[in-house]
UniProtKB/Swiss-Prot annotation:
Quaternary structure annotation from Swiss-Prot or TrEMBL: The complex is composed of two ATP-binding proteins (CcmA) and two transmembrane proteins (CcmB).
Name of the molecule in the record: Cytochrome c biogenesis ATP-binding export protein CcmA
Reaction(s) the record says it catalyses: heme b(in) + ATP + H2O = heme b(out) + ADP + phosphate + H(+)
Species name: Pseudomonas putida (strain GB-1)
Gene: ccmA
Claim: Transport is one of the keywords in the record: yes
């Protein structure tokens, strides 16, 4: 399907507090949307809404012109979600984690998994239990999924967390390349992006912050 994600009159309330309202935007192939704003402004909540993990207080999200809530299967087939936490199992190795994560959507070969780990600078760590890795290395294990056979829509919550300078530069380049190849990225980050695709834009939720 051709990716077309639309937010119409979107509002979100958490703990009796309005985070944002009347949000309208559209996303398609090649777009990158950076969601910014102070802590507590609803950045993660907006990501979760777009990923179908929450329901809006008002308004709606459309996928291909149809309500997102009616298209769970279609969304799952095009979405890669990586939350703020690495989301990996400490007792599994880096390879085992990626094998398990990929099996939930599209299984990947051992060769592909090793290549993905090499792409994020973890060559030689394939058989290392993740509880022995640093926070940055654990984050890179999670981000290695972006180098496997991936769906077009990436929704990423603070993907640069715990990465060193080289890791940040590599991830920036990979996200931009994904968009330039027709993919779509929605992300939150406090990091100032140095490399932005032509379809980049920013949505600041700060105007609703108390």
């Amino acid at each position: 399907m051709t990716l077309h994600l639309q937010a119409a009159g979107l509002a979100c309330e958490r703990d009796w507090r309005l985070l944002f309202e009347q949000l309208d935007f559209e996303l398609g192939a090649g777009d990158m949307l950076q969601i910014s704003g102070p802590n507590g402004s609803g950045k993660t909540s907006l990501l979760r809404l777009l990923a179908g993990l929450m329901q809006p207080t008002a308004g709606q999200i459309l996928l291909g012109g149809k309500p997102l809530a009616e298209q769970r299967h279609a969304l799952a087939s095009i979405l890669l979600w990586i939350g703020h936490a690495a989301g990996i199992k400490d007792l599994l190795t880096a390879e085992e984690n990626l094998t398990w994560l990929c099996a939930l959507h599209q299984p990947a070969s051992r060769e592909a998994i090793w290549a993905a780990l090499e792409a994020v600078g973890l060559r030689g760590f394939e058989d290392v239990p993740c509880h022995t890795l640093s926070a940055g290395q654990q984050r890179r294990v999670a981000l290695a999924r972006l180098h496997l056979a991936c769906p077009p829509l990436w929704i990423l919550d603070e993907p640069f967390t715990a990465l060193d300078k080289q890791g940040v530069a590599q991830l920036e380049a990979h996200l931009a390349a994904h968009c330039e190849q027709g993919g779509t990225v929605v992300l939150t980050t406090h990091h100032t992006l140095e490399r932005k695709p032509s379809g980049y834009r920013e949505l600041n939720l700060g105007q609703w912050a108390a």
